[in-house]
Amino acid sequence: MSHPDPEKPFARLTPERVLAAVEGLGLAADGRLMALNSYENRVYRIGVEAESLRVRDPRALPNAVVAKFYRAHRWSDAQIREEHAFALELAAAELAVAAPLVIDGDTLHQAGGFRFALFECWPGGAPELD
């Protein structure tokens, strides 16, 4: 059995581990998983059973979340939490920002050696051209 390259830590982030991380926070993943574009981190749109998710914004899909897995050694937990706090502050001021979900009193979580956060899934909209 080969071991993942230590220079490529995301090689260990399998679809099964992504779904398990989401389910570990009490959401019921339905098996849908789509990788999204991200240069530094790994970001996925994950389907969840609607009854396991309470969205706070009407723009959010009721049956999907976005999971952002942070690159190891790039940012400290404090830096990530500062970014999350700022996004939550903007959301509280009713600015259009998808802030991280607060689950069990925190926005930053760990699973399988990876730090990650969950966000409401906001689909894109048509631009306002006036």
Segments predicted by a language model, with ranges:
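Residue-level detector of alpha-helical secondary structure
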Residues: 17-24, 42-45, 82-89
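Detector for Asparagine
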Residues: 3-5, 37, 41, 63
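ATP-binding pocket architecture of kinase catalytic cores
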Residues: 48-130
